[in-house]
Amino acid sequence: MKTVITELLGIEYPVIQGGMAWVGTAELAAAVSEAGGLGIIGAGGAPASWVEEQIHKVKEKTDKPFGVNLMLLNPEADAIAELLVKEEVKVVTTGAGNPEKYMEEWKKAGVRVIPVVASTALAKRMEKAGADAVIAEGTESGGHIGETTTMALVPQVVDAVNIPVIAAGGIADGRGMAAAFMLGAKAIQMGTIKAKDIDTKVTGRTTGHPVRCLRNQQTREYLKLEQAGASFEELEKLTLGGLRKAVVDGDVIHGSVMAGQIAGLVKDSRSCKEIIEGICREMKNIVLSQAENIGR
């Protein structure tokens, strides 16, 4: 399935794995890339040494293109940015900050730079800075979110820039992929695996950094503190290391389990290959069937 994004990144299907911290390990990234999508190592708040280790592991498992998601608030962002050049990583997606200071070095090294954006203003700025594409991520997505839905955000970003747009947030099957392409996207990004649609809560609105997570003891405590007018420091103390606690330590009660609203649509467990091939096949069938209906 060819699009401008598959040509740009050298992948078979226009499906990109979300940059999920601690979840986006070498094993998952390699599996996604082997299946024809673009696997992504989620650097999150991890040290550069961990990211380097994951890059080496992916290279051992696949010769297909893969990328790294760099959260620019990471204390070791500078070191990781240099590491991507040293290790000849082909693609970097960025979030939680402005990647402009790294652009020149990345572009010289031939790295494809794809920032995550939540507004047309940021999309335009990233295009001007030299981004190869942007990921327009709606508020339905898991983790750090903006306020605009995918349905509203994607066409606005498509109209605002002259580089390819990848849609993210609330896409779990061929219907969502077809909708994204009708809005002008050239690929999709997926992350959330499985949960109930009623189980996500948004915390951190009072801090200006909203995050969508599965509802658990931590979100209940956080929302209670927010409603009581707790300070940023108090709220930060509660969530510090929460994602690692959930993903690495397995404490999904007191940890931060980031997930999107679309989780309720995912009702079974399948391999990366089955998911990617299935969603692309379903998308094609939907577009063809709807074209026939409209033509009647």
List where the protein language model places each region.
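Conserved active-site-proximal phosphate/metal-binding subdomains
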Residues: 152-166, 172-296
